[in-house]
Amino acid sequence: MAVRKLKPTSAGRRFQTVSDFEEITRTRPEKSLTVGLTKKSGRNNLGRITSRRRGGGVKRLYRIIDFKRDKTGIEARVAHIEYDPNRTARIALLHYTDGEKRYILAPVGLKQGDVVMSGVNDRNGEVADIMPGNALPMQRIPVGTVIHNIELYPGKGGQLCRAAGTYAQLVAKEGKYALLRLPSGEVRKVLVTCVATVGQVGNVHHESIRLGKAGRNRWLGRRPKVRGVAMNPIDHPLGGGEGRSSGGRHPVSPWGMPAKGYKTRDKKKASSRLIVKRRGQK
């Protein structure tokens, strides 16, 4: 995949860049693996805003992705590489030898016609190779391997490293835990029985995309972000004042929580004991 720069025929297109979508082999999704997506606009079941600055955007179909990779021991052929509007990564449509179809995240190097497999074949004991797109428990993955779509709890499905271009590295194994270096720099313990997929998530040039205009953000369902100092005092702790005031206090959230450098993580959180090195720590 490469990034295409547009001709500056307008102010909005002057700095705009788009993907060339050269890896895409089909435009329409597999109908049996799609469901309608109801827009929530950042509201919860009571209709109250729980995620600000969400709403609008283009209508989408949700593609059902296999994050668990629990169909073990059966080979699958990559039928197509497709675009998914619900995520930054591309997705691959797999045709299993028993006739089932599933979507997975498309890693770097996976192309149409490749064969992938998960886990171990129960009939002949064959283990999936260390190749992009193959999924294995981390106890069977060599130290130093680049992985993505990593489970935090066995059987729950991949939760880490699912965005375009992301990956973690398996740096060590200690007893029942594997040590992973995550994209943030954090080193974390995960059970070796958790499943991960070999390789780096594809569409690595996504970070080079420049939207170029506000309208492209609106297409994605992102609404404008209003500064606290531009609000009224009823709406924000920094609001109000005569003329262009600075807010009169250190930057805070709309609920008064310090916004710059204040640690918000619960010190008693159980998973803290699994974090060997925090992100940003030298």
Swiss-Prot record:
Pfam families: Ribosomal_L2, Ribosomal_L2_C
Chain positions covered by the region annotation Disordered: 230-282
The entry's keywords: Ribonucleoprotein, Ribosomal protein, RNA-binding, rRNA-binding
One GO MF term: transferase activity
GO cellular component: large ribosomal subunit
Bias (Basic residues): 265-282
InterPro entries: NA-bd_OB-fold (IPR012340), Rib_uL2_dom2 (IPR014722), Ribosomal_uL2 (IPR002171), Ribosomal_uL2_bac/org-type (IPR005880), Ribosomal_uL2_C (IPR022669), Ribosomal_uL2_CS (IPR022671), Ribosomal_uL2_dom3 (IPR014726), Ribosomal_uL2_RNA-bd_dom (IPR022666)
Keyword check for Transport: no
GO biological process, one term: cytoplasmic translation
Function (record text): One of the primary rRNA binding proteins. Required for association of the 30S and 50S subunits to form the 70S ribosome, for tRNA binding and peptide bond formation. It has been suggested to have peptidyltransferase activity; this is somewhat controversial. Makes several contacts with the 16S rRNA in the 70S ribosome.
Cross-referenced HAMAP family: Ribosomal_uL2_B (MF_01320_B)
Family membership noted in the UniProt record: Belongs to the universal ribosomal protein uL2 family.
Subunit structure: Part of the 50S ribosomal subunit. Forms a bridge to the 30S subunit in the 70S ribosome.
Protein name in UniProt: Large ribosomal subunit protein uL2
Source organism per UniProt: Desulfovibrio desulfuricans (strain ATCC 27774 / DSM 6949 / MB)
Encoding gene, per UniProt annotation: rplB
